Amino acid sequence: MSDHHKVVLVTGCAKGGIGYEYCKAFAEQNCRVFASDISQRMQDMADLEPDKIETLELDVSSEKSVASAVESIISKCGRIDILVNNAGIGSTGPLAELSLDAIKKAYEINTLGQLRMVQQVVPYMASQHGGSIVNIGSVVGQVPTPWAGSYCASKAAVHAMSNTLRVELRPFGINVVLVVPGAIRSNFGSNSSERLVNYDWKLYKDFKEAIVERARASQGGKATDATVFARHVAQKVLSSRPPKQIVFGHMTGLFAMLSWSPLWDKYNLVVEYVIKRILLIFKRKFNIDNQSLKGDNAGSAGYDIAHILLDYAKQQLRQEQQS
């Protein structure tokens, strides 16, 4: 089948997200695109061009919903050539205090949601002797960052799952492409941060601003435009030889360097980068001395975000002793 007539299913396509842009990018390449999202967000796909893109309800956390959506496409087209596993949610907060329900939800959607889609689509792709599965990972799936351990872990699982599937599905002519986005401009960060504004942290209540800042970290001024990103991915996926990985977007160079660094050095660099972004917040909150982030501490294997917590604890203890 020609690339101009490929049937593409994309999950998580509400307007404002990257999935919405994937749909438009594949449609520009004359693919038959099926955009999907949960029932509450169906209206957010209403202005996708109906002559090029069809919309349908799909909840990746529900096996019944996934099966129904896939069967609907098969009944209309007889095949699915490309699956873009884009649906996902943010999960921000310190692991020691983030609720297990929130962590489970991140895995349910970000990781198991992709696997549910794969298990429903693969039998059809195998019968047609070909297809491409495009799993959306993240740079933090390779290099985890503070305050986002749950999200990082869910994406790390996607990376491992994709690399395994690539080998297991090769005998059936099915390509597996792992997309590793950097900082891409979308509503993802704002949606995540809004959920955190009124969260009642206990141990970390004084770090609330820093945690919210982490949720917005991917949406800085230099974030890559989502349209540019989606077009790049679509072009690569539709090529005669799709790559195993597509790494693209702001900050991917930094994270690629960190992923090849020795573990101790990688962690220091990640923490120092995060510290630079949130240091002003910390200084306002805790009056931390810049010298505590320099000198011997910065080069030691034991230096990590815990030093900031320790500095704060020491300051609190001194204040209590003086009062």
Model-based region annotation:
Residues 2-34:
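Canonical Rossmann dinucleotide-binding motif of NAD(H)/NADP(H)-dependent dehydrogenases/reductases
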Residues 118, 154-157:
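Active-site helix of classical SDR
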Residues 94-95, 102-104:
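Substrate-binding pocket helix/loop in short-chain dehydrogenase/reductase
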